[in-house]
Structure formats: structure tokens, C-alpha cells
A protein has these predicted regions:
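Cysteine-nucleophile active-site neighborhood
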Residues: 1-55
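Short conserved micro-motifs at the rims of enzyme active sites and ligand-binding pockets
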Residues: 38, 68-70, 102-107
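Acyltransferase
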Residues: 81-150
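Catalytic beta-strand/loop cores that center a nucleophilic Ser/Cys/Thr
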Residues: 46-88
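Short, glycine-/Ser/Thr-/acidic-enriched flexible segments
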Residues: 2-3, 32-33, 61-66, 97-100
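Hydrophobic, well-ordered secondary-structure elements that form the walls
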Residues: 25, 59, 96
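Conserved NTP-handling cores and scaffolds of large molecular machines
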Residues: 9, 32, 66, 102, ...
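Short, low-complexity, polar/charged sequence segments that are solvent-exposed and flexible
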Residues: 14-17, 44-48, 75-79, 110-114
Length: 150
């Protein structure tokens, strides 16, 4: 998502395929250069516009640079992450799982002019898992399932 919002994605080592340079959408003034190291890491960051702590995970393979990186989306361990367009209306980040953070989600929706709900992500997940477990208990013969699996 973040990388394709930029102007170009270059892959000189052919990590993701044979195309050396791919044109992005150009919504952010950034360029990404693919690198061999893929990073998938649980991350805690601070969303700069709201000051909210964001818990999520970071996925990226490469380095993104450019003018819009001077307006980072967040910081993690005092390292800037992401970019915000000069207009302030387009942003990108390597952070995933942002909307599972209740305070960030409320801030984001409010800034879109929408009324945030009081939904608690963790409570909703627990409720859904409990409902699934109840359904499975009612409709699946667990002992038969286990004996077949052996």
C-alpha cells in the first residue's frame, strides 16, 4: 500500500520479479528501493498527529525516501516511519494493524468528519471467538473429529 502510493518502486536486484522500475500512483513524493532483507516485526509507534501509541506490526522490504518523508506518519524508537503528502490528505506507513488501536481509530474517523463508535476491538474479537467456540461445541462432534485426525 505505502510503496505504491509513491512515484517509483525500484527493484535492481530482482527481488520481487524481473521489472526493474515500476511506476507508482504518485500520490506521495517518495521513491522505494527494494532490498533483500524483508522485515516483519511487531511494533509500537507514536502517531505524530494525535500522540496516540499504536501497536501493530511492520512489514517492509526496502527503503522509502523522498520529500514527503520529511512529514512522517509516526515514530518508532525515535525513527520516523511513513510519509504524509504536502496537502496532508494522503499518508502512507509501513505499519499494519492501525485500526485495531481504539484511540487511533477514533482520532482517524473524527478527522474524516465521521462519528467514531465506542467499539472496543479486543472485546469484539473475544466476543466473536466465544461465539465461534459455542457454535462448534453445538455442531461438531469434537471426539469424532479428534479420532479422525489421529
Amino acid at each position: 500500500g505505502y510503496q505504491i502510493l509513491g512515484k517509483t518502486i525500484s527493484d535492481p536486484q530482482g527481488i520481487e520479479g524481473t521489472t526493474v522500475v515500476t511506476q507508482g500512483l504518485g500520490y506521495l513524493d517518495v521513491h522505494t528501493k527494494m532490498k533483500a532483507d524483508k522485515k516483519v516485526t511487531p511494533t509500537t509507534a507514536i502517531h505524530l498527529a494525535s500522540g496516540n501509541q499504536i501497536n501493530g506490526y511492520e512489514i517492509h522490504i526496502g527503503e522509502t525516501t523522498g520529500n514527503d518523508c520529511t512529514r512522517p506518519f509516526a515514530t518508532s524508537n525515535n525513527v520516523p516511519d511513513g510519509a504524509i503528502a504536502y496537502s496532508g490528505q494522503i499518508m502512507g506507513t509501513y505499519l499494519h494493524g492501525l485500526f485495531t488501536n481504539n484511540n487511533f481509530r477514533k482520532f482517524f474517523l473524527k478527522n474524516l468528519g465521521l462519528k467514531p463508535s465506542n467499539l472496543d476491538f479486543e472485546q469484539e474479537i473475544e466476543k466473536s471467538l466465544d461465539q465461534l467456540a459455542d457454535h462448534l461445541e453445538q455442531h461438531v462432534d469434537i471426539d469424532a473429529f479428534i479420532s479422525i485426525a489421529r
